[in-house]
Amino acid sequence: MAAPEPLRPRLCRLVRGEQGYGFHLHGEKGRRGQFIRRVEPGSPAEAAALRAGDRLVEVNGVNVEGETHHQVVQRIKAVEGQTRLLVVDQETDEELRRRQLTCTEEMAQRGLPPAHDPWEPKPDWAHTGSHSSEAGKKDVSGPLRELRPRLCHLRKGPQGYGFNLHSDKSRPGQYIRSVDPGSPAARSGLRAQDRLIEVNGQNVEGLRHAEVVASIKAREDEARLLVVDPETDEHFKRLRVTPTEEHVEGPLPSPVTNGTSPAQLNGGSACSSRSDLPGSDKDTEDGSAWKQDPFQESGLHLSPTAAEAKEKARAMRVNKRAPQMDWNRKREIFSNF
C-alpha cells in the first residue's frame, strides 16, 4: 500500500482559456476566507490541480485571507491571462491551524516543517553547518540556529500591518506584543516577543514609544523592521554589540578571546565595564591612570557624613516615585498597526 501524500499547500499556475479559468470562487458562512466551490472538467483550473473545497491563501504572491470576495476577485483579474494561486485542502488547512503556522509558497515546495521544530516555520536566518557555539544555539545532532537579527519587510494591507507594538515597564525598548495570523507582519516573519531595533534603517532603541510609532508611519504603505528574538537579543547584549542590518547576513560579532573586548572586535570603541575588579587600574580618555573607589561608581562612599547620608536617602525616595501618568498619552503604551 502506497504511503499517504504528505500534507502541504499547493501552488496552482493557471493560464486563462477561451472560457476563462474554469473555477468558481465563493465565501462560506461561518468560515474565514474564500473557497473553490467548483472546478470545470477539462479547464485550466483542473489542469493546474485546483480542487473543489480548496481554501485560497494567496493570489500572485499576495496573502488574501483577510480580504473580501470582491477584493480577491479583483486580484485574480489584475494579471491578464494568467494567475498564481496558493491553496490548501481541508486536511492541510486544519494541520496548519493546529500548529499555528502561516501558509507560504515555500511550504508548497518543501512541505510543512517537522512537527518537533520549535522555530517553525523555518526562518530565513536559520542555517546549518559548523559554527561557534557562542554565536549559535547548541545542537548535538549537528544543525545550529545562528543567532542573527531579522529584517522584516512589511507591505501594508487593507487591515494594516497586522501587529501590536508595546513598551515594557520592566525593560527598555519596544516589543512586538502580538502578530495577527495571515497578516503582512506574519508573512514577513515578525513574531511576538521580538524587540524592535531599527525602523527603515534608523536605530530606534533610544526613542520613546510615540517616536517609534511615528517612524513606522513615516512611510505610507511599507516598513522595514530590524528585530531580534529574546535569545538573539540576550546574545548580542552579552557581547555588548548593537545589532544592525549587516548582521542579518554578514559576519557575526565574535565572543571575547584573549582579553579583546567584543566592542573592539565589532569595530566600535571599547567602553569600560562595570564588572571590573575593585581597585583595578583604568585609563581615562586622556590616557592618565587613576584608582577607582569600588563604591564610587554606584554612587556610594565609604565614609559619608550624616548630612550626605540624609540627603542621599531623601534623593532615593524621590527617585523611586513613579511619574504621574499623562492620561492624554496613555495610548502610547500600546499601538496597533
Swiss-Prot record:
Chain intervals with Polar residues compositional bias: 255-275
Localization of this protein: Endomembrane system; Nucleus; Apical cell membrane
Domain PDZ: start-end pairs: 11-90, 150-230
Superkingdom of source: Eukaryota
Stretches for region Disordered: 107-144, 240-337
Keywords of this entry: Cell membrane, Membrane, Nucleus, Phosphoprotein, Repeat
Positions where Phosphoserine occurs in the chain: 130, 183, 254, 269, 280, 303
Disulphide bonds in the chain: none
Listed GO CC annotations: apical plasma membrane; endomembrane system; extracellular exosome; focal adhesion; nucleus; plasma membrane
Compositionally skewed regions (Basic and acidic residues) per UniProt: 134-144, 327-337
SMART domains in the cross-refs: PDZ (SM00228)
Keyword Phosphoprotein: yes
GO MF term list: beta-catenin binding; cadherin binding; identical protein binding; phosphatase binding; protein-membrane adaptor activity; signaling receptor binding; type 2 metabotropic glutamate receptor binding; type 3 metabotropic glutamate receptor binding
Bilayer disposition of the protein: Peripheral membrane protein
Alphabetical list of PROSITE patterns matching this protein: PDZ (PS50106)
Quaternary structure and partners: Homodimer, and heterodimer with NHERF1. Binds PDZK1. Found in a complex with EZR, PODXL and NHERF2. Interacts (via the PDZ domains) with PODXL (via the C-terminal PDZ-binding motif DTHL); interaction is detected in glomerular epithelium cells. Binds ADRB2, SLC9A3, P2RY1, P2YR2, SRY, RDX and LPAR2. Interacts with MCC and PODXL. Interacts with SGK1 and KCNJ1/ROMK1. Interacts (via the PDZ domains) with SLC26A6 isoform 4 and isoform 5.
Protein name, UniProt field: Na(+)/H(+) exchange regulatory cofactor NHE-RF2
Naturally occurring in which organism (per UniProt): Homo sapiens
